[in-house]
């Protein structure tokens, strides 16, 4: 049987109070059945409830069990593909609409935190750190591109300036985005779940969707119950399994690994990140890190294709941390865990309909914290009959992985090896 308890992570250890939630053991009827109580599902549910829909959420494990409660906690704007790449793929009109939405997810998070008084250690400020002149040139282009779409809270930093905000000698410069930032991701999910329930929504935990009965009046079956709904939103992402085979064929779960140090104390914590900003480098296979409210360092990186859990996470990530911060060589690691995100071949999200009444969003490809909150709003708009923004995402190409589900992992790993060489040699 699959493990449905939270992993032994820093987030689970420092989570706010988690109320018990029921297992679905009846037949219920609702307007919208949401499958998955991660960010996509919770964001969808909140927007729908705020607009008068009855909503039932089915969660196979616990609220925020998947990527939403395990990620690096960074509020990173835009998508995993730059908007200019999207423009070359879909043309200027569709790219303009997608570009205008690229910075909305972070605003939604802040609005939710304020409106529902969610305690999740929200901090402003995110740094993109360049390891080479080539990467710095890319950041300069990215700043110009983002400013085209009205995103102006950006500062290019030379080597001297980035050293003021990151206590690491390996960066040649960077870009500071003050509308970026970081949060305790599990506490954000728990707060959003409480908001769903405060508006009359129902969340069932330990209630996996095992079958969707499609048709004019779709039914979602769980081991002990079922939900009849006008609409279904599929929001399982990397933890969906094969519930919807046509979605599984066009995406691949991938694992990323995270460690958390023991408390560092004020002096050492301030030496690493004086302004409490979060940081990610500009490599294809990137490293990311941030401070916590209790003066620890969370550091993540690495990709394991096919969602396998590595045997020794600390052995993979600690050397990356020490390369950035050798002064942490004697610091103890208190927590190490892995979590899955869903990769698409295009590295763009996949959004669409199955028939007239089953909607889905998946495949954030590493930019899930902000995109999922936007996705919830866009899905809710579509169910209300306002589908222009939904269609802008739905019209993006959904490419299958070469070789199907059997060969997608080795093909992706080969691609990652190639990009890892590019990172190593600055190509």
Enumerate the language-model features and the residues they cover.
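Glycine-rich FAD pyrophosphate-binding loop
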Residues: 50-70
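C-terminal catalytic lobe of FAD-dependent flavoproteins
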Residues: 307-309, 314-424
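Extreme N-terminal leader/targeting segments of oxidoreductases
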Residues: 1-32
């Amino acid at each position: 049987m699959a493990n449905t308890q939270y992993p032994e992570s820093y987030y689970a250890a420092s989570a706010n109070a988690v109320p018990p939630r029921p297992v679905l053991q009846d037949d219920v009827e609702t307007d919208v059945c949401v499958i998955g109580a991660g960010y996509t599902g919770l964001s969808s549910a909140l927007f729908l409830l705020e607009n008068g829909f009855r909503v039932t959420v089915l969660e196979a494990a616990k609220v925020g069990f998947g990527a939403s409660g395990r990620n690096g906690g960074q509020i990173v704007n835009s998508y995993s593909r730059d908007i200019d790449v999207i423009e070359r793929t879909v043309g200027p009109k569709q790219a303009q609409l997608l570009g205008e939405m690229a910075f909305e997810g972070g605003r939604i998070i802040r609005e939710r935190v304020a409106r529902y008084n969610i305690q999740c250690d929200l901090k402003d400020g995110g740094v993109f750190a360049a390891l080479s002149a080539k990467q710095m040139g890319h950041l300069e282009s990215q700043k110009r591109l983002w400013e085209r779409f009205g995103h102006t809270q950006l500062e290019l930093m030379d080597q001297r300036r980035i050293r003021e905000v990151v206590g690491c000698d390996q960066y040649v410069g960077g870009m500071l985005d003050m509308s970026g930032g970081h949060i305790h991701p599990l506490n954000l999910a728990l707060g959003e779940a409480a908001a769903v329930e405060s508006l009359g929504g129902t969340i069932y935990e330990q209630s996996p969707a095992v079958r969707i009965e499609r048709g004019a009046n779709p039914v979602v079956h769980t081991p002990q119950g079922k939900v009849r709904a006008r609409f279904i939103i599929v929001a399982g992402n990397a933890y969906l399994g094969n519930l919807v085979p046509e979605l599984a064929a066009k995406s691949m779960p991938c694992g990323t690994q995270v460690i958390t140090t023991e408390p560092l104390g004020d002096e050492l914590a301030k030496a690493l990140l004086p302004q409490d900003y979060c940081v990610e480098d500009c490599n294809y296979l990137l490293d990311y890190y941030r401070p916590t409210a209790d003066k620890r360092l969370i550091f993540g990186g690495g990709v394991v294709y096919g969602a396998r859990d590595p045997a020794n996470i600390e052995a993979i990530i600690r050397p990356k941390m020490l390369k950035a911060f050798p002064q942490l060589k004697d610091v103890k690691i208190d927590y190490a865990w892995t979590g899955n995100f869903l990769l698409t071949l295009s590295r763009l999200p996949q959004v669409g309909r199955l028939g007239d009444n089953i909607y889905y969003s998946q495949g954030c490809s590493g930019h899930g914290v902000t995109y999922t909150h936007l996705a919830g709003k866009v899905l809710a708009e579509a169910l209300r009959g306002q589908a222009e923004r939904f269609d802008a995402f739905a019209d993006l190409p959904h490419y299958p992985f070469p070789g199907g589900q059997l060969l997608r992992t080795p093909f992706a790993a080969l691609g990652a090896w190639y990009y890892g060489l590019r990172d190593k040699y600055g190509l």
